[in-house]
Design a protein with these regions (language model features):
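Active-site pre-Tyr helix/loop in NAD(P)-dependent dehydrogenases
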Residues: 35, 131, 256, 268
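Catalytic histidine-centered segment of alpha/beta-hydrolase-like enzymes
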Residues: 265-274
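Conserved HGGG/HGGXW glycine-rich cap/lid loop of the alpha/beta-hydrolase fold
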Residues: 21-67
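Conserved acidic functional residues
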Residues: 34, 105, 271-272
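Flexible "cap/lid" subdomain of the alpha/beta-hydrolase fold that forms the substrate-access gate
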Residues: 3-5, 15-17, 41, 56, ...
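Alpha/beta-hydrolase fold catalytic core
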Residues: 1-29, 50-53, 87, 92-98, ...
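Conserved catalytic core of Hanks-type protein kinase domains
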Residues: 48, 253, 271
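Hydrophobic residues on the short alpha-helix immediately C-terminal to a glycine-rich phosphate/catalytic loop
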Residues: 45, 114, 280-284
Length: 284
């Protein structure tokens, strides 16, 4: 951990969320990870934001260094509660004020849910290769499709329980496809996989929730059209799944939006182009 980084205690009912804060000035930036990753997704981005804004990053319940209660309902709706707990702890540390919310991948639904409920707290909503509701151009990566499709997901999970080597190879292949730079891929994927193994129950439960979550949130399209704060849509243009069509759909729905398609970046846009992404975030 960097010497400037401070641990932020966050209680989530009886459980504990792991969160870190880097000091700075202005509205705090809240970085949220998706699946199947954790706060280390922002390791390359953080040095480019440090000192420019206060930055908090945290592991959702069930992930990384946060608690992992057994049989917990790990859903997008409950992740919005995780975000609310982090905001509450941040308010106690820094005082209540506007926030820059940064969502990537599966953190799109909880981040947008919270933003729609608390527009007065949002300085800027930043969307990095994420999703919220079903659209015709939204695609699931192969591993996510395997684990989220009813009927076949139970068989797939049974296989990887018996074959941990196959689980590791599938993870390495799929997450590796999200990173453009071979050197960074070689460093980051094993680090993420090490913390993924104990997070697998949360991963599978979120996959169970995935299709219903995106279908249900089509009911929020009207709320998205009425959302007042600025929205900055920053997508890696090489992402085949959460692709430029998804980005353009977000930009069309939110009335005060900017669209930035980053050439040379894929699904992990903050890993592929950290300086450019940090500059766009800090500008909000």
């Amino acid at each position: 951990m960097d010497t400037a980084t401070q641990t932020l205690p966050v209680a989530r009912g009886a459980y504990r969320l792991y969160a870190e804060v880097v000091p700075g000035t202005g509205p705090p930036v809240v970085l949220m990870h998706g699946f199947p990753d954790n706060i280390h997704l922002y390791d390359r981005l953080l040095p480019h934001l440090a000192g420019r804004r206060p930055v908090v990053r945290f592991d959702f319940l069930g992930w990384g260094r946060s608690d992992k209660p057994a049989s917990y309902p790990y859903t997008a709706t409950n992740q919005a509660g995780d975000l609310a707990a982090v905001v509450g702890a941040l308010d106690e540390r820094l005082g209540t004020g506007p926030l820059v919310l940064v969502a990537h991948d599966a953190s799109g639904p909880p981040a947008i849910d919270w933003a729609l409920a608390h527009p007065d707290r949002v300085q800027t909503l930043v969307l990095l290769n994420t999703y919220y509701h079903w659209t015709p151009t939204l695609r699931r990566p192969p591993a996510i499709a395997l684990y989220s499709t009813p009927v076949i997901r139970a068989a797939a999970r049974a296989v990887v329980r018996r074959r941990p080597d196959l689980d590791r190879r599938l993870y390495t292949w799929q997450v590796g496809k999200f990173i453009q730079d071979p050197g960074e891929r070689h460093l980051l994927v094993p680090q993420l996989y090490k913390q993924f193994q104990p997070a697998r129950p949360a991963f599978w439960r979120l996959n169970d929730d995935l299709l219903g979550a995106v279908l249900a949130r089509r009911r929020r399209i009207g709320d998205m059209r009425r959302f007042g704060p600025p929205v900055r849509v920053i997508f890696g243009a090489r992402d085949r799944y959460l692709n430029p069509h998804v980005a353009r759909n977000f930009a069309a729905l939110f009335p005060h939006s900017e669209l930035h398609l980053i050439d040379g970046a894929g699904h992990y846009v903050q890993v592929d182009q950290p300086q450019q992404v940090a500059d766009l975030i800090a500008g909000g």
